[in-house]
């Protein structure tokens, strides 16, 4: 377990020194605190006979869902440095298993072996050389700190001018944007002689004019109320001031 943790610590210190934000003393202090934290975490979750057991628990991971690894953050707090000064990639995964440490930059990239151990008694210099060789084999794209999510976002933001023109709203004519006026209300004509046929069925009125189209026939006259003259019933007559009923004048 010591060799694997040493490989992880060398891996982080190499990245931090490349970022060149911290002094040598701060980097060494961070490496010491991280070593103690990982040793305490892994001591009861280390299974040499079955290396894959507890792999998720020992994994160190940073991605868009987990921006900061809690163990690395704790090492920063214990060494009085800022997490942002480490300069770690936005997507980084380290699998710390018995006899092997693997790494992956970005969620969609292939993993590579940081260090593998056949001999438990390897010294720190040999471990450091293994980690250095592994990092040197990684391309510069891995070290740029770009993530797969950033690449997807940048691709989405790139819009061709032709696509903007094609997606623009079509030019509408003014007549298409103005709704036709509501038709005026006209009363139905009164019934006239001859509106009913001999079979008892009423003739149909002309079909209504579709909404929005002018009437092609004769113009309808505006509605005018018909004056009503009241005619007194038979037997009643009036004088100048009031109506007189002749039955009321009969002797009792």
Curated annotation (Swiss-Prot):
Specify where the region named Disordered lies, as residue ranges: 138-162
* Taxonomy, superkingdom: Eukaryota
A GO CC annotation given for this chain:
nucleus
Stored Gene3D superfamilies: Anti-proliferative protein, N-terminal domain
Matching Pfam families: BTG (PF07742)
SUPFAM superfamilies the UniProt entry points to:
BTG domain-like
Q: In which tissues is it expressed?
A: Ubiquitous. High expression in the ventricular zone of the developing central nervous system. High in ovary, testis, prostate, thymus and lung.
One of the GO BP terms on file = negative regulation of cell population proliferation
Q: Which family does it belong to?
A: Belongs to the BTG family.
- PANTHER family given in the database record: B-CELL TRANSLOCATION GENE, PROTEIN BTG3
Cited function: Overexpression impairs serum-induced cell cycle progression from the G0/G1 to S phase.
Q: What is this protein called?
A: Protein BTG3
